[in-house]
């Protein structure tokens, strides 16, 4: 049976989720029946079809005041500010993909349930949610009774697969992560007022240190790592693709060869973890659907101190995981 999805918020992630559904292997199992966004339908259709990062959408796209038509499929569109007023019940929505960045707490996301949706999957770290999921790492924790779930962040989705392997095989005692992260829409092209003084500065002109909860969130995904990891972000002037730089102290001495072997073996057959030995740079991973691509070229070891790096397309990889997690949530059993 096809799972009926609605997308709330048609920004970078919302649009890429829809693109991934139509250009990937998801259409036989998933159907987007509705999109709610406060923007004009004509503008949203144009932005969906033409993308500065991911190129032209390969299929036919049409629109009218009440719908977006993608490759012959009609998707109802609305512009309703209060999620509790959305027509999810009449549209038979099984799962809402909450992509606005606004309704990330359990209380706020519950408005979708009031509107008649079966479940909610949040495209961001969530507060007081029933589960935080990194597909390919802990999605087996999902249960049919879970109704409001977080898909974590793009950075946690990159970090968790690598940390899982290192902890399982070597025993992480503690560690620090830096994500060297592409700029995003919560920054500004030029200097402008922002309560975070770092993010008040031009995204295109500086490397900008800022905070992230991605490392701590790994403890929600892998409870055995709770309290062992922390980190920060450095936003850099590239439009897409980011890099996790992880340094951990492990329980025993190891070597570059062993660390690389462990990650290579873990990547074989993994739906989310890749392994790279080529001399590649960030642009080479643009539009890569994997969550985390470990780069064996940059592994460093000093006794029990290990540095590992992994690339991730912070838009496309995460958008694909939203669909994978939606499938896992729909299939979950108690």
UniProtKB/Swiss-Prot annotation:
Pfam families: Gp_dh_C, Gp_dh_N. It is found in: Cytoplasm. D-glyceraldehyde 3-phosphate binds at residues 153-155, 184, 199, 212-213, 235. GO terms for cellular component: cytosol. It is an enzyme of class 1 (oxidoreductase). It catalyses: D-glyceraldehyde 3-phosphate + phosphate + NAD(+) = (2R)-3-phospho-glyceroyl phosphate + NADH + H(+). Its main location: cytoplasm. The active site is at residue 154. SUPFAM superfamilies: Glyceraldehyde-3-phosphate dehydrogenase-like, C-terminal domain, NAD(P)-binding Rossmann-fold domains. Its EC number is 1.2.1.12. Belongs to the glyceraldehyde-3-phosphate dehydrogenase family. Catalyzes the oxidative phosphorylation of glyceraldehyde 3-phosphate (G3P) to 1,3-bisphosphoglycerate (BPG) using the cofactor NAD. The first reaction step involves the formation of a hemiacetal intermediate between G3P and a cysteine residue, and this hemiacetal intermediate is then oxidized to a thioester, with concomitant reduction of NAD to NADH. The reduced NADH is then exchanged with the second NAD, and the thioester is attacked by a nucleophilic inorganic phosphate to produce BPG. Homotetramer. This is Glyceraldehyde-3-phosphate dehydrogenase. The lineage of its organism: Bacteria, Pseudomonadati, Pseudomonadota, Gammaproteobacteria, Pseudomonadales.
């Amino acid at each position: 049976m096809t799972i009926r999805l609605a997308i709330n918020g048609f920004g970078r992630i919302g649009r890429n989720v829809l693109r991934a559904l139509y250009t990937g292997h998801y259409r036989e199992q998933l159907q987007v029946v509705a999109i709610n966004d406060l923007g004009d339908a004509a503008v949203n259709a144009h932005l969906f079809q033409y993308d500065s990062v991911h190129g032209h959408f390969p299929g036919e796209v049409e629109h009218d005041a009440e719908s977006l038509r993608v490759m012959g499929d009609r998707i109802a569109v609305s512009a309703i500010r209060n999620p509790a007023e959305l027509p999810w019940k009449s549209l038979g929505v099984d799962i809402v993909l909450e992509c606005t960045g606004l309704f990330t707490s359990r209380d706020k996301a519950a408005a979708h349930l009031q509107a008649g949706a079966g479940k909610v999957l949040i495209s961001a770290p969530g507060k007081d949610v029933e589960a935080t999921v990194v597909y390919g790492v802990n999605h087996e924790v999902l249960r049919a009774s879970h109704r409001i779930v977080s898909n974590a962040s793009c950075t946690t989705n990159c970090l968790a697969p690598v940390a899982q392997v290192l902890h399982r095989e070597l025993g992480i005692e503690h560690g620090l992560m830096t994500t060297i992260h592409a700029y995003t829409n919560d920054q500004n092209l030029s200097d402008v007022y922002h309560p975070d003084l770092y993010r008040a500065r031009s995204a295109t002109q500086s490397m900008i240190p800022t905070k992230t909860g991605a490392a701590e969130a790994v403890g929600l995904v892998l409870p055995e790592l709770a309290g062992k990891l922390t980190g920060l972000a450095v936003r850099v002037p590239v439009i897409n693709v980011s890099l996790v730089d992880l340094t951990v102290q492990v329980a025993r001495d190891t070597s570059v060869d062993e660390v690389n072997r462990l990650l290579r073996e873990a990547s074989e057959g993994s739906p989310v973890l890749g392994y790279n030995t080529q001399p590649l740079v960030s642009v080479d991973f643009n539009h890569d659907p994997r969550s985390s691509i470990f780069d064996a070229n940059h592994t460093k070891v000093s006794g029990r101190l290990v540095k590992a790096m992994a690339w991730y397309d912070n838009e496309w990889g995460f958008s694909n995981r939203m669909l994978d997690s939606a499938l896992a949530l729909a299939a979950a059993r108690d």
